[in-house]
Amino acid sequence: MSLIEKLFGKRQKTASIARERLQIILAHERNGRAEPDYLPQLQQELIAVISKYVKIAPEDIKVQLERQDDLEVLEVNIVLPEPQQRTVA
């Protein structure tokens, strides 16, 4: 073992360094993702189910996911029409 290797240690291969960095970036992005993949589909399914009973427009439903420390809160806001317009034909 040469003196340089003793002082600085063995160098990692570029591919393994790149892989480690990519894993860190992916883990960070997964944790920082504001909206899970299923929210748009959940919103569409809610629209379909609620439309069976009440006449609503797609923009009348808002689905949000909020994170607070270790807690996740799914918030669903639905704007309902006036009572005389609620029935579905």
UniProtKB/Swiss-Prot annotation:
InterPro entries: MinE, MinE_sf. Keywords: Cell cycle, Cell division. It comes from the Bacteria. Gene3D superfamilies: Cell division topological specificity factor MinE (3.30.1070.10). Pfam families: MinE. One of its GO terms (biological process) is cell division. Prevents the cell division inhibition by proteins MinC and MinD at internal division sites while permitting inhibition at polar sites. This ensures cell division at the proper site by restricting the formation of a division septum at the midpoint of the long axis of the cell. Belongs to the MinE family. This is Cell division topological specificity factor. It comes from Laribacter hongkongensis (strain HLHK9).
